[in-house]
Every structure is written in C-alpha cells, then in structure tokens.
Amino acid sequence: MKRPHLVHFSAILNEDFLSIRAGMTMKENPIPHGGVYYNLAQELAQSIEKEIFSPRFPIASIRLLKGKTYQMKIVAMANGLEVYRKIFESDSHGNFNFKIPLNDERKNINALSVFEVSLTPGLELLLGSYIPLVLSRPSKLIICDFDKTLVDTKYSTTKEVYFSLTKPLEYFPTVTRSVAILRSFIKKGFHPFIVSASPHFYEEAIRDWLYQRKIFTAGIFLKDYRQVFSLFEMDLTPKDLKLHGLYKLNHLLDILLMSGIPNDIVLMGDNFEADPVIYLALVSFLLEHQDPRTYWQKLKRLKAFQMNHKQDAQLLSKFYQLNNIRQKNHNQQITAKIYIRRKLQEESIEIPDVLKKFASVIELYDGNAELLNASVKEESQVQRAE
C-alpha cells in the first residue's frame, strides 16, 4: 500500500515570516504481520531501527524522478492554541515553498501539524508534526557544499556514476578537514544548510550520512533533475546538468529569503568547479549596497552563470527580494567568510575582476580525504586493482 510521504520538511521562523519548504512523494507503507500487539510493536520498532541506522543507496530513492501534485494542510499551534490553518498546493513535482506572514499570535508558533488532503476525498492523512527552527538575532548560518567538500565523490565515468548510485555514501572517502570545520561552526551556534549538485533523489542518503556524524541540518538543497525534463516547469534546462552556477546561486538566495539576512554567514565549498565565484557573487551583494539590476547585469556575463530569459528573470527577482530585506535592516552589520577546499596545491584561485574586491574573505585549506571504514578501504583498493 502506498501513502504520501514527506521527503523533506523545513520550517524557519524569523522576525517577519514562517517560511516552509517541503517535498512530497508516494512511498510504500509496509504493514507488519502478526496478531499480537506486542509483536506488531516489535516488528515496527525493528523496521524503524533499520530505517534510521542502515545507510541507504541513492538508487533506492530513484522513485523521486516521478512527479505528482499534492495538497498540504498546515495547522500551526502557539502555546497549545491553534493560530493558523491553511491548505497549500504543490507544483507538479510535489514541491512546496511558501511563507506565512506573522502577527502577534503567529510569532509564537512552536508546533506544526502537516496533512495531505487531496488524494482521498474527506480524508486528511497526518504526515508528521514539526517544531520550526527559530532564528533570533544575532543569527548565524553556515552553508556547505557536499560533493568534493564533505565527501570525495566521483562521477567522471559511467562506471563511477553507477557505483555512486548503488553504494552508500560511506563507500566514498570522507574529507575530514571539511567535517571538522563544519562541526566547529555548529558548536559556535551556526545553523547548517547543505547545498549540493547531487540529484534530488540523493537526499535521504545524504541525510543518513550527515546524521551518522551528528550533523543535523536546517535543510538540504539538491538539484531537481525532474525540472530538466519537465515540459512545463523548466526552472532547469539540459545545460544545467553540468553547469552548477545557476541552481546553486538560486538555492543560496532561497535560503536567505527563508531565514532572513544573517549577522554572520560562512560558506564552504571546493575549487573543483565554480564554488568560489558563486559564493563571492552572494557575499559581494550582501556586503556592498548595490542596485540589484545593475549588479546582476555584471554577474550574469560570467562563465559560471549561463541562463535563459526565464532563469534570468527569476534570479533578478530574488535579488530584488533580498535587497528589500537588506533595506529594511540597513544598519545591520554582516560578517562573511568563505572556506574553499584546494583542488591540488594551489595557493590562490582565479577570481573575475568584478568580484576581486572581496577575495580576502576566501580561505583555502587542504582537504585530504580518508576512508574511515576498513572494509570499505579494502573494497576500494580491490576495485582500483581491477
């Protein structure tokens, strides 16, 4: 039997809005066999334990290539009282992204109940209850890449792609230096977000990998490959399968539009692709007051950002939204830092002239990858020998 399932759900409460981002799909709902309540509970507990502690293969979530429209009912509670109730409709891929404006009652929201209400007329299916992440001042965010930054993944050949889909992420070397940097900022009160070029169906596998290392993120933002092949919602096009500038900058803007502009922001990435340019594009806009249109006209000519007219308009619109937030808090001081894992042994990186003014916020570091699991290391050595 299948029932709707939340792939991810993020709720962030700041001074002005409750921002919600969610993804929904259909998933098999196994029913334990047995006639005794104890046995049922025991089987269910074993099922949950397996779900939590067994690393999942990315290919196991390939079902997420399918899309469907859903309706989500949100019931918000504040101090035990219901203060908000509304039904929202997803896009054709089951994604939700919306904001709930706050008033005196809603600013104290501390619990959310989530239902799917469209699949069976008259039936509301409870998908879960959630506590929103409350961002108070001063706010601190750390946004980290995943591939080549936290895990030394490889997708260069067909064999490597197949291997990445059919093995847990544990089978790839961990970049221990990157994990240490990320953890150090989390201990200082920074809220972590993950932004990666991995396909959207890697989300459960990535979350497993992070949770095993006690890294609990405020949100995981991946590239939704369904948009590339959609006939209607083409936020991404075939060129974006290999180019990451558009989607990554888009997700960075989404995070700040959900959370508000932080007092301290740290960005982590690598020098294997365009992370330094993408991160500097955001940081320079935050640190220097500029007209969004004039600023974007300079940036979109860079090689890292190649887009069609629709994508151009969408990004410009988000820059204007971010600018409105910045103007509202025009006296706010912002501190920014960018950590970039070296590709080789380079002492500096190439930065476009339009962004060189802010190059000093970048710190390069060596990220030697290590296979922490001995059995995994042996298997990797055998594969190299073959």
Predicted regions and their residues:
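Short, small/polar residue-rich loop motifs at catalytic or cofactor-binding pockets
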Residues: 83, 136-138
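A short acidic-Thr-Gly-centered motif at the start of a beta-strand
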Residues: 132-136, 256-259
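Intrinsically disordered, serine/threonine/proline
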Residues: 1-131, 191, 332, 356-386
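Short, acidic loop-to-helix structural element flanking the phosphoryl-transfer center
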Residues: 167-192, 200-204
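Asp-based phosphoryl-transfer active-site loop
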Residues: 140-155
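A metal-dependent, Asp-based hydrolase signature
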Residues: 64-69, 156, 163-164, 202-212
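A solvent-exposed, charged loop/short amphipathic helix patch at secondary-structure junctions
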Residues: 39-55, 157-170, 235, 285-307
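C-terminal cap/substrate-recognition subdomain and adjoining C-terminal extension
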Residues: 199-386
